[in-house]
């Protein structure tokens, strides 16, 4: 009898292992969330994309990103795998993050205008069949936080609200995009921290957004994805009334800012340029209001991006409770995910599962 029981047990274990190999989702369900510990800072943190001594106190979590949501039909030259090293500190008012990841190229050429030999202007674009660009765009990073209880987030992380379009349909609606973001039922919201190296990075901020259950493109063109409440600022495509050239430029010209128009340099476009010259494709202005809650300093050097991030532990004001994760309970575990966009509009590398952050 004992031998028979042992045989049955062994067979059961073998079959379970075979099922997990055949069905990765089953294996993933057994995977526990990764863990990040935010440690109390002893000294003030200065946002400068450099690790001052205070960061020595925090232990880095390494998160491997090796999943892609889709293959663009016109090619993809971006990274297919990278590892994000992340640390966290906090003080009485703020939570901080220090992130580093390898990216061999600094991608800033987001839809720039190029002067042609015949005197006309052409905006560089190479969109794929989904209407998105993977050639003339920008580097980005996303942090995706569960605000309230989102079913499946702890196990699946970001993937629980990323819905791919299949056979031209998304949630029964005709759609050409590769996928859409939305939660699966009313009341579920996710805080989306989106760093954009061209549109927000030069201004020292993330684009603070959130995701809810909206699936009607008539109600919101970006489906469940929304910007937080703002009182001003933002970014806007730089083209004239008939879209044949830029409307604004930097004056004086700035090589450092050649791919974006800054508020303090913004001037009406005057064409004194020669063939091959570049004018930015985007005009950027700092967000005011909750959409600008997250501060950052970023730097690319020797094939690596470094971001030093700061946000209030708790936010207040209009709709803060449904648009922002609130780090108000130091005994709670906060679940999130990370993704990296290498010169891509929506294509990105991400990880399976979630990360659980606790405070110590």
What are these regions (language model features)?
Residues 11-22:
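Bacterial N-terminal signal peptides
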Residues 79-95, 100, 106:
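N-terminal onset of structured domains
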């Amino acid at each position: 009898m004992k031998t028979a029981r042992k045989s049955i047990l062994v067979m059961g274990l073998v079959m379970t292992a075979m099922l997990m190999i055949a069905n990765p989702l089953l294996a993933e369900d057994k995977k526990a969330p990764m863990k990040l510990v935010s440690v109390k800072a002893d000294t003030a943190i200065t946002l400068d994309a450099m690790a001052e001594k205070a960061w020595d106190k925090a232990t880095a979590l390494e998160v491997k990103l090796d999943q892609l949501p889709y293959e663009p039909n016109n090619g993809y030259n971006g990274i297919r795998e990278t590892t994000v090293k992340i640390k966290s500190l906090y003080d009485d008012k703020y939570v901080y993050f220090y992130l580093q990841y390898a990216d061999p190229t600094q991608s800033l050429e987001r839809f720039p205008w190029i002067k042609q030999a015949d005197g006309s202007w052409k905006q560089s674009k190479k969109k794929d069949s989904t209407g998105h660009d993977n050639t003339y765009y920008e580097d980005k990073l996303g942090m995706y936080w569960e605000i309230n209880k989102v079913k499946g987030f702890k196990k699946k992380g970001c993937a629980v609200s990323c819905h791919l379009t299949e056979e031209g349909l998304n949630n029964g609606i005709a759609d050409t995009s590769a996928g859409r973001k939305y939660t699966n039922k009313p009341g579920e919201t996710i805080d989306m921290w989106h760093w954009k190296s061209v549109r927000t990075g030069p201004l020292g901020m993330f684009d603070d957004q959130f995701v809810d259950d909206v699936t009607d493109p008539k109600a919101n063109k970006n489906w469940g994805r929304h910007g937080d409440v703002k009182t001003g600022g933002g970014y806007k495509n730089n083209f004239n009334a008939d879209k044949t050239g830029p409307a604004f430029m930097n004056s004086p010209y700035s090589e450092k800012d050649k791919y974006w128009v800054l508020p303090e340099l913004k001037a009406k476009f005057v064409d004194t340029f020669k063939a091959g010259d570049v004018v930015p494709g985007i005009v950027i202005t700092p967000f005011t209001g909750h959409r600008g809650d997250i501060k950052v300093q970023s730097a690319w050097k020797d094939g690596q991006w470094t971001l030093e991030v700061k946000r209030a532990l708790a936010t207040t004001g209009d709709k803060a409770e449904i648009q922002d994760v609130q780090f108000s309970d130091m005994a709670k575990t906060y679940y999130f995910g990370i993704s990296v966009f290498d010169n891509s509009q929506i294509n990105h590398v991400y990880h399976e599962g979630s990360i659980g952050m606790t405070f110590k």
